[in-house]
UniProtKB/Swiss-Prot annotation:
Source organism (scientific name): Homo sapiens
One protein family per Pfam: Neurochondrin
Disease: Neurodevelopmental disorder with infantile epileptic spasms: An autosomal dominant neurodevelopmental disorder characterized by onset of severe and frequent epileptic spasms within the first year of life. Affected individuals have global developmental delay with delayed walking and poor or absent speech. More variable features may include poor overall growth, high-arched palate, and delayed myelination on brain imaging.
Modified residues (N-acetylserine): S2
Upper classification of the organism: Eukaryota, Metazoa, Chordata, Craniata, Vertebrata
Record carries keyword Acetylation: yes
Protein name per Swiss-Prot or TrEMBL: Neurochondrin
Main localization of the protein described in the UniProt heading: cytoplasm
Length: 729
């Protein structure tokens, strides 16, 4: 059979591509095409390659393009099977005068015909061809060769059909298809547009796996698309706006793409546009803000103007969408605008290296205040039937980001919304799995049609904690929160989150958000201890909280890198112990003794004596572990010292326990070994408070202090109260 005959046989694949499953079947049981049936019989009975080729030619003549329905394709497959196409794809020897790619083209055409059937597209015999099919996309050859072009089209037909099966994307990724598609697109050869379309589909279906298998190639495509975006002057720039979010990596966008992406967006957003042109640009900017913060925006005047433009546009969109009741909300666009507003909040509150100048910050705070007012207006209209919708979650998130930094403005509106926020947080807390699913839906809604990199927190309560921390200081909002049951909810939440730090969990991979959430809860409880002590005494949830603090602190203070959390737990527990001192749990039980021993450890290890060159006397200095975080720690430490001092007269067993720990003796020894001039007055006051109460509470403590030169040390540091106490019998 000649090479021309082989090429003609390849027309079977052409017919298959043009065929449609929806067209009426040609071969119903009572009216099959007799000629086609005869040729299919010949195909089934063929004894060698030549007879099979001849039969294929006859079949293509009997079946006109577009006439092959699903049943006919299946009967052709039953007649041909996979063996013959397999041989065509792998043959090394072609007939004289026939290019070897013509045989492969016929093999691919047959596969393309078969892949029109979804069952066959998922067949192992098709799946194991993925690696060889992928190589055809990047094979060198004459770009004008019709047979080669036909083979490339058929290859894309096969791969696209496989991608449409349930497990197809996974097989394509494992078979090297993503890299091949990237190279085919970057080569801009025949069919490169089909490569891009298939890449988009695979990224949408399995983004993480795609990046894991082909990150360098995908980054090369991103660089190419970014350059095209920056240069585009026609409508293609709007198409690229929709494509680019799909090609941003789940971790960090390469810095070399920043300039092109920002320049392209600045050109689009700085023009007068319709909403269909502007919205994809806002969504791309939101994805970049979510992945990179403000790193992709250049410093200087142009960058600050661009950032201000982004935030202003976002605020306008939010107000237009949410202020008018009954208006259909483009939730994906508004959620993207929320991400840009959050970027604006971060930059407005940044003290160092902010992109914004002070007048710009003032202007943006004003427009964001108006947009947040629209968000509050929207949330006040939300009924219980909508509480589980992703857009509501996104709206609560941006409100939480605002309240974390600003609670003085919109106070009336915020107080009006607080009951809803408490109920909403409680609903999602009680249905944690649905809340986690909501976070993913919000991320998908906000950033792109595919799964984004960093996911947003999965519980509404964590989003609201910083704002509630500020609000519990104020009388009005605090009363509303207490009335709505927020303290009880916070206690339950704290206990649930604390379980993640228990020995049964791998705390080395504990998300930072969990620890930050626990610390913020502690700050809220500290506010309540100071401003609403009666609540602590009467609400049973705080008794449970106290028990958890007591049992947890001993292990926590021993863990590396968790000193700040330990400080929060110790200080909160000491302050609560003063209010709950009559509780049976605090009457010298093993748990209470363990807690106070751990609290003493935290308080006693903060400072050390440090030698100074050229001086005989050491100075009081922070211990290495405390030094790096003392700015965040010192307020808790001083508050903890004060709270411990207050506990001593309330708990008779505490002074003997402190004596057994040798803290008072070691404290006096430390003060005696350093220069008094190196000890700040506030430190002297804190140390004297503890020593005086211990001395007053227990005779053995007084004797131990005298033996440690306590009176002399008190005199050196002008601790009059301690000196007087130690001079008494």
């Amino acid at each position: 059979m000649s090479c021309c005959d082989l090429a003609a046989a390849g027309q079977l694949g052409k017919a298959s591509i043009m065929a449609s499953d929806c067209e009426p079947a040609l071969n119903q049981a009572e009216g099959r095409n007799p000629t086609l049936e005869r040729y299919l019989g010949a195909l089934r009975e063929a004894k060698n390659d030549s007879e099979q080729f001849a039969a294929l030619l006859l079949v293509t003549k009997a079946v006109k393009a577009g006439d092959i329905d699903a049943k006919t394709r299946r009967r052709i497959f039953d007649a041909v099977g996979f063996t013959f196409p397999n041989r065509l794809l792998t043959t090394k020897e072609a007939p004289d005068g026939c290019p070897d790619h013509v045989l492969r083209a016929l093999g691919v055409a047959l596969l393309a015909c078969f892949c029109s059937d979804p069952e066959l597209a998922a067949h192992p015999q098709v799946l194991n061809k993925i690696p060889i099919l992928s190589t055809f996309l990047t094979a060198r050859g004459d770009p004008d060769d019709a047979a080669r072009r036909s083979m490339i089209d058929d290859t894309y037909q096969c791969l696209t059909a496989v991608a449409g099966t349930p497990r197809g994307p996974r097989h394509l990724i494992a078979g090297g298809t993503v890299s091949a598609l990237c190279q085919a697109y970057l080569g801009h050869g025949y069919g490169f547009d089909q490569a891009l379309a298939l890449l988009v589909g695979l990224l949408a279906a399995a983004e993480t796996q795609c990046w894991k298998e082909a990150e360098p190639d995908l980054l090369a495509v991103l660089r190419g698309l970014s350059e095209d975006f920056q240069k585009a002057e026609d409508a293609s720039k709007f198409e690229l706006c929709q494509l680019l979010p799909l090609f941003l990596p789940p971790t960090t966008v390469p810095p070399e793409c920043y300039r092109d992406l920002q320049a392209g967006l600045a050109r689009i957003l700085g023009s007068k546009l319709s909403s269909w042109q502007r919205n994809p640009a806002l969504k791309l900017a939101a994805r970049l803000a979510h992945a990179c913060g403000s790193d992709w925006i250049p410093a200087g005047s142009s960058g600050s103007k661009f950032l201000a433009l982004l935030v202003n546009l976002a605020c306008v969109e939010v107000r237009l969408a949410l202020e008018e009741t009954g208006t259909e909300v483009k939730e994906d666009v508004v959620t993207a605008c929320y991400a840009l507003m959050e970027l604006g909040i971060q930059e407005c509150t940044r003290c160092e290296q902010s992109l914004l100048k002070e007048p710009q910050k003032v202007q943006l705070v004003s427009v964001m205040k108006e947009a947040i007012g629209a968000v509050i207006h929207y949330l006040l209209q939300v009924g219980s039937e909508k509480q589980k919708e992703p857009f509501v979650f996104a709206s609560v998130r941006i409100l939480g980001a605002w309240l974390a930094e600003e609670t003085s403005s919109l106070r009336k509106e915020v107080c009006q919304l607080l009951p809803f926020l408490v109920r909403y947080a409680k609903t999602l807390y009680e249905e944690a799995e649905e809340a986690n699913d909501l976070s993913q839906q919000v991320a998908n809604l906000a950033i792109s049609p595919t799964t984004p990199g960093p996911t947003w927190p999965g519980d509404a309560l964590r989003l609201l904690l910083p704002g509630w921390c500020h609000l519990t200081v104020e009388d009005g909002p605090r009363e509303i929160l207490i009335k709505e049951g927020a303290p009880s909810l916070l206690c339950k939440y704290f206990l649930q989150q604390w379980e993640l730090t228990s020995p049964g969990h791998d705390t080395s991979v504990l998300p930072d958000s969990v620890e930050i959430g626990l610390q913020t809860c502690c700050h809220i409880f500290l506010n309540l201890v100071v401003t609403a002590p009666g609540l602590i005494k009467r609400d049973a949830c705080f008794t449970s909280l106290m028990n958890t603090l007591m049992t947890s602190l001993p292990a926590l203070v021993q863990q590396q890198g968790r000193l700040l959390l330990a400080a929060n737990v110790a200080t909160l527990g000491l302050l609560m112990a003063r209010l709950l001192s009559t509780s049976p749990a605090l009457q010298g039980t093993p748990a209470s003794r363990g807690f106070f021993a751990a609290a003493i450890l935290f308080l006693s290890q903060s400072h050390v004596a440090r030698a100074t060159p050229g001086s005989d006397q050491a100075v009081l200095a922070l211990s290495p572990e405390y030094e790096g975080i003392w700015a965040d720690l010192q307020e808790l430490w001083f508050l903890g010292m004060q709270a411990f001092t207050g506990c001593v007269p309330l708990l008779p067993w505490l002074a003997p326990a402190a004596l057994r720990s040798r803290w008072p003796q070691e404290l006096l020894q430390l003060l005696g070994s350093v220069s008094p001039n190196s000890v700040k007055p506030e430190m002297v006051a804190a140390y004297q408070g503890v020593l005086v109460e211990l001395a007053r509470a227990n005779r053995l403590c007084r004797e131990a202090m005298r033996l440690q030169a306590g009176e002399e040390t008190a005199s050196h540091y002008r601790m009059a109260a301690l000196e007087q106490c130690l001079s008494e019998p």
